[in-house]
C-alpha cells in the first residue's frame, strides 16, 4: 500500500519516521508493505531520506491511483479542508490529527467519506494528555 503524508512539520515528519522504523511490524499487521510515496510540503528537504518524495501540488496525490491512504498533518482549516475533501472524493482513505479541521468541518468530511465509500479517521490529544478526541 502506498500512502501520502500532507505536511512535513513535527507531526508529519514523525509519521514518516514511525512508519519507517516500524515498517516490518506494520506490514505484518496490514498484510502488505506500507510505503510513503509522497510528502506534500511547501519546502524542499535536500539531503534527507524524503528529498525525492517531496511534492508541492496536492492534486498529484489525488490523481495517483496507487495512493490508498493519505495522512493530513498540516493543521488549520485551510488549505487542509480543500485538500482532504478532494482526497475523499478521489476515493482515498484519510487520517488526520488536525483538531481545527475536525471541529470546523468534521461532520461535512464524514459525510463526504461515507458518500464515497472511504474512511475519514481522526484522533488527537489535548495538552499532550489522553486521547480525548476520536
Task: Pin down the residues of each PLM region.
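N-terminal glycine-/serine-/threonine-rich beta1-alpha1-beta2 phosphate-ribose binding loop
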Residues: 1-89
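Structured catalytic core of nucleotide-sugar glycosyltransferases
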Residues: 69, 95-98
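Rossmann-fold NAD(P)-binding glycine/threonine-rich loop
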Residues: 80-90, 97-134
Amino acid at each position: 500500500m502506498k500512502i501520502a503524508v500532507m505536511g512535513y512539520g513535527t507531526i508529519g515528519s514523525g509519521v514518516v519516521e514511525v512508519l519507517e522504523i516500524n515498517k516490518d511490524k506494520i506490514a505484518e499487521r496490514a498484510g502488505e508493505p506500507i510505503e510513503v510515496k509522497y510528502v506534500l510540503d511547501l519546502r524542499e528537504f535536500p539531503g534527507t531520506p524524503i528529498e525525492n518524495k517531496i511534492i508541492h501540488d496536492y492534486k498529484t496525490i489525488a490523481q495517483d491511483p496507487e495512493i490508498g491512504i493519505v495522512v493530513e498533518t498540516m493543521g488549520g482549516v485551510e488549505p487542509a479542508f480543500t485538500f482532504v475533501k478532494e482526497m475523499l472524493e478521489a476515493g482515498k482513505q484519510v487520517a488526520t490529527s488536525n483538531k481545527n479541521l475536525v471541529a470546523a468541518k468534521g461532520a461535512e468530511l464524514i459525510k463526504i467519506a461515507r458518500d464515497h465509500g472511504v474512511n475519514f479517521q481522526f484522533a488527537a490529544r489535548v495538552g499532550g494528555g489522553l486521547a480525548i478526541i476520536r
